[in-house]
Amino acid sequence: DDCLGMFSSCDPNNDKCCPNRVCRVRDQWCKYKLW
């Protein structure tokens, strides 16, 4: 499966961001997971 890179738009209900990235509802793009 391809994962979504940094700043890719994403769906918070179906988070396909790459490892150590997270899809936030507020932003709806993949960003670094800091914790």
UniProtKB/Swiss-Prot annotation:
One of its GO terms (cellular component) is extracellular region. Monomer. Its main location: secreted. It comes from the Eukaryota. The presence of a 'disulfide through disulfide knot' structurally defines this protein as a knottin. Blocks Kv4.2/KCND2 voltage-gated potassium channels probably by shifting the voltage-dependence of channel activation to more depolarized potentials and by binding to the S3-S4 linker region of the voltage sensor domain. The keyword Secreted applies. This is Kappa-theraphotoxin-Tb1c. One of its GO terms (molecular function) is ion channel inhibitor activity. Disulfide bonds join C3-C18, C10-C23, C17-C30. Belongs to the neurotoxin 10 (Hwtx-1) family. 59 (Tltx) subfamily. Expressed by the venom gland. InterPro entries: Huwentoxin-1 (IPR011696).
